[in-house]
Amino acid sequence: MVFRRRPDKRTPLLTFERILVPLAGTEADEPALRLATLLLAGTEGQASLLHVIEVPFERQLDAEDPAAVAFADEILGKAEAFLTEHGIQVRTGIAQARAAGAAIVDDAAEQRIDLIVMGLRYKKRPGGGWDAGRTVPYVMRNSPAPVWCLRVETEDLANTP
């Protein structure tokens, strides 16, 4: 009896062509970028980076905010450099919206995103509860694509028994 090795034609279990990584400029961004890098490494896939500038209702939605745009450019520039260093194709975007969650969901639908990977800053509430903020729950409820959230361990949590 002769056994021959078949060429490995299996497809990876998880394949994504377009991953959206919303960036807020917090410590929660790095784990999301690292996961997107792992998922897209060695593929023709693309990471779509988005920073949303939330505009308060007191201001016009299209009002210019040079400081916020400069902050967004800095965040997106660093993230783009990290991903391109790892051979990942990158698309970047800045959106102005009243709420970041709606802008993220709209971008995901418009770009036909396969997966959203976002960081979650875990905040404790009195009485032992926790708070995920407004954006992550909104995206999880309304996204046209699967959403993977990575909870970041903050200094507060690291010292909690």
Spans of features found by a protein language model:
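Glycine-rich, Arg-bearing micro-motifs that act as flexible, cationic patches
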Residues: 118-142, 156-160
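Small/aliphatic-rich secondary-structure junction motif
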Residues: 8-66, 88, 142
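General small-molecule cofactor/ligand-binding pocket signal
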Residues: 48-50, 91-95, 148
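Structural beta-alpha unit
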Residues: 1-10, 14, 84-116, 121, ...
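Active-site phosphate/pyrophosphate- and oxyanion-stabilizing loops and adjacent acidic/basic residues
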Residues: 34-37, 105, 137-138
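Short glycine-rich, flexible loops that bind phosphorylated cofactors or substrates
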Residues: 28, 100, 124-126
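Short, well-ordered secondary-structure micro-motifs
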Residues: 32, 59-62, 103-105, 128-129, ...
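Short, solvent-exposed amphipathic alpha-helices that sit
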Residues: 35, 67-79, 103
